[in-house]
Regions:
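Catalytic-domain carbohydrate-binding cleft regions of carbohydrate-active enzymes
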Residues: 1-161
Length: 161
């Protein structure tokens, strides 16, 4: 309701990129709030004990409620360098079932964003045959294209940590 009243947009996705663990009750809360998609990040980048086995998947809550979920394979603060894009693709665990991988870039901590140089790099990647194919898109578009209706997604039934 807040985004609709302030910006004229209905938001159907929740992003908690800088959280180390997410409670098993969250899918139920998200779904009851009109949220279909969930994105978090720390499980794939900061957990040195248990490697989370999926990047694009369905997260099933404690009551059986499902939401689509994305845990990008690399950190949410990158400079969009070719080596970082390559690392993101190589670390992506759902190549066969999850559609594309999400790579976020920019100076995320402190409220900053992508620079002109980072965006220019994105435009140059298509000209490099050794680079994974990239596409610049918005979060909602990415989630809908790669998760919604994807019957090949794994189901994670439990907490995210």
């Amino acid at each position: 309701m807040y985004f609709r009243s302030r910006f004229g947009k209905t938001v159907n996705n929740a992003w908690l990129p800088d959280v180390f663990g997410n409670s098993w009750i969250l899918p139920q809360i998200l779904k009851k709030s009109g949220v279909e998609y969930f994105v978090s990040n720390k499980m794939s980048t900061w957990n040195d004990t248990n490697r989370f086995p999926h990047n694009n998947f369905i997260w099933r809550g404690i009551d059986g409620t499902d939401v689509y979920a994305c845990v990008p394979p690399t950190h949410f603060i990158t400079w969009n360098m070719p080596s970082q894009i390559q690392e993101n693709w190589e670390a992506y665990q759902d190549k066969e079932s999850g559609g594309q991988t999400l790579s976020m870039f920019g100076y995320g901590d402190g409220g900053s964003c992508a620079t002109e140089e980072m965006i220019e790099l994105m435009h140059r990647f298509d000209k490099l045959s050794v680079m994974p194919k990239t596409e610049q898109t918005g979060g909602t578009s990415f989630l809908e294209k790669n998760l919604k209706g994807n019957e090949n997604l794994a189901v994670w039934d439990g907490e995210l940590y």
